[in-house]
Amino acid sequence: MNLLIKGGRVIDPSQGIDDTLDVVVENGLVKEIGKGLATSAGAETIDASGKYVVPGLIDMHVHLRDPGLEYKEDIISGTRAAVAGGFTSVCCMPNTKPAIDNKAIASYIINKAKTEGACNVFPVGTITQGMHGDRLAEMGELKESGCVAVSDDGKPVKNSELMRRALQYAAGIGIMVISHAEELELVGEGVMNEGFTSTELGLKGIPRVAEDIATAREIMLAEYVGAPIHIAHVSTKGAVRIIREAKGRGVKVTCETAPHYFTLTDDAVRGYNTNAKMNPPLREADDLAAIKAGLKDGTIDCIATDHAPHHLDEKDVEFNEAMNGIVGLETSLPLSLKLVDEGVLNLSQLIEKMSCKPSELLGLGRGSLKAGNVADITVIDPAKQWTVTESALASKSKNSPWLGATMAGAAACTVVGGKIVFSGR
């Protein structure tokens, strides 16, 4: 399929481009970008007037639940949700059943995604075997099989010596370690952020310091061995400060946050709303402000969703018993566009955090519209108004705290490898 994407505002931070231009796609690759372009006879033309044309969005942190938990989500439904949200690539976390701790599981995911998925899927392998936290996984084998990072996401690696060795080994073979930073003894039986709201609701709280201490440990270990570390789903003002200070002294630390941490506070839990229960939990207003400040000054490198689908039966229970996590692939873009409206980021900075930087950190070879690159492209309609409903979501699971909310902004067209895989709501 050959394409001419015409008259859109092309924003490509990798090339410093922000202008009204045309994009020509031929044989699955970007052929050229410029004004007044034409393409071969029979090419499909996409009118991008009034829209943004950007490198395909990349979500470096999703849970596709495949294999083993397909009643929540699978590669087919998860990638359909991804392209509906404008994502052309996703990185799937390894807390599946069985976990992605060997070549066979990684190969299964890659092969299924190639034959049945709607977008690129890059698996993340485990740090430890079975995510049990006692023995390192075969990281070299995982990298060779196509894993782009390693993580025990969903829980931390408690053993500091094991984490030190993981960082050393991963650095030696050139694969990123993604840390779920959480001090479990401080978390205890907590189910939401510790503070005024948890006290008022009579729910056991999780103190911010549980994340802060674990973040500091990871940074100190990485600094000690001279290895890179990536901190997942940053949610506290303390973690932002610790990461900012570490970057200032040259530590190879990067991090991500998720849209719910810069749009919601723990007030969303009122009414015991289980669709506002996730890990890390929603924090307070000063944490939200710190997350925005971290995005603005570059402390926070990436925006990821931590898309975590759960079946209704796992959410329609008492708050204490409900599973942690929310779906986020289809709401991430409009929520993140609010950062531009608020002056936190400009459009180029937003696309950098949602496409270019994730690709750079994980070595995906995406995140750019340079001629010759794979044509992964997202066309964004910033004026599109739509309502989040269960029927509007492509994900198998509907556990979103924004059900019933009206969103501004959506993917108008998602192109993966030169093929149109989604054409708007």
From Swiss-Prot:
EC number(s) reported in the record: 3.5.2.3
Co-factor binding details:
Binds 2 Zn(2+) ions per subunit.
Which residues participate in Zn(2+) 2 binding? D153, H180, H233
Q: Which SUPFAM superfamilies match?
A: Composite domain of metallo-dependent hydrolases, Metallo-dependent hydrolases
One MF annotation (Gene Ontology) recorded for this entry: allantoinase activity
Binding positions for substrate? Answer: H63, L64, R65, N95, N279, H310
The record's Gene Ontology cellular component field reads: cytoplasm
**Any one of the GO BP annotations:** 'de novo' UMP biosynthetic process
Give the metabolic or biological pathway.
Answer: Pyrimidine metabolism; UMP biosynthesis via de novo pathway; (S)-dihydroorotate from bicarbonate: step 3/3
User: What InterPro entries would the database entry show?
Assistant: Amidohydro-rel, DHOase, DHOase/Allantoinase_Hydrolase, Dihydroorotase_CS, Metal-dep_hydrolase_composite, Metal_Hydrolase
Write down the chemical reaction(s) this protein catalyses: (S)-dihydroorotate + H2O = N-carbamoyl-L-aspartate + H(+)
- Cofactor(s) it depends on: Zn(2+)
Q: Which UniProt keywords apply?
A: Hydrolase, Metal-binding, Pyrimidine biosynthesis, Zinc
Q: Does the keyword Iron apply?
A: no
Task: Give the binding site residues for Zn(2+) 1.
Answer: H61, H63, D153, D306
Active-site residues are D306
Family of the protein in this entry: Belongs to the metallo-dependent hydrolases superfamily. DHOase family. Class I DHOase subfamily.
Its function, per the record, reads: Catalyzes the reversible cyclization of carbamoyl aspartate to dihydroorotate.
Query: What's the name of the protein?
Result: Dihydroorotase
| The organism's taxonomic lineage, starting at the top | Bacteria, Pseudomonadati, Thermodesulfobacteriota, Desulfuromonadia, Geobacterales
